Curated annotation (Swiss-Prot):
It comes from Bifidobacterium animalis subsp. lactis (strain AD011). Keywords: Ribonucleoprotein, Ribosomal protein. The gene is rplQ. Belongs to the bacterial ribosomal protein bL17 family. GO terms for cellular component: cytosolic large ribosomal subunit. Coiled coil: none annotated. This is Large ribosomal subunit protein bL17. The lineage of its organism: Bacteria, Bacillati, Actinomycetota, Actinomycetes, Bifidobacteriales.
Length: 148
């Protein structure tokens, strides 16, 4: 069977990459942050955010989809109970990648990927409401001008 040519690979085969990302996601949800290389962190971020989105839904099908990737039941339980509740107000951007000094042995670019646990600032919510109100007011003015 030929190996897929689409996109860069972190490991020797696509199956190995899937397993490696699943293990890294398990460690991320278990510990809250992990130190790894920058390319691995960049490949892990979309997977972790997708799994958190499934956990926020909270239904049985979402739990089963997460269990396909994360095989540890205690980590899945933590994801659905604790992490999903922390991320309830957040609409995305559940993880943060911070670059750190290169790894000592081989000078590989290292990074820390962590879950963002800070609450969403209320200022952003107020700004979004104000922008929405401005758009509604502009549309109303256009309809009134067209009616006259």
């Amino acid at each position: 069977m030929p190996t897929p040519k689409k996109g860069p690979r972190l490991a020797s085969s696509p199956a190995h990459e899937r397993l490696m990302l699943a293990n890294m996601a398990t460690s991320l949800f278990e510990h809250g942050r992990i130190t790894t290389t920058l390319p691995k962190a960049k490949r892990l971020r979309p997977l972790a955010e997708r799994l958190i989105t499934f956990a926020k839904r909270g239904d049985l099908h979402s739990r089963r989809r997460v269990m396909r990737v994360i095989r540890n039941k205690s980590v899945v339980h933590k994801l659905f109970t604790q992490i999903a509740e922390q991320m309830e107000q957040r609409e995305g951007g559940y993880t943060r990648i911070v670059k750190i000094a290169p790894r000592k042995g081989d000078s590989a670019p290292a990074a820390i990927i962590e879950l963002v646990t800070e609450p969403v600032s209320p200022k952003k919510a107020v700004v979004k409401e104000a922008e929405a109100a401005t758009k509604v007011a502009a549309k109303e003015e256009q309809t009134e001008a067209a009616a006259e």
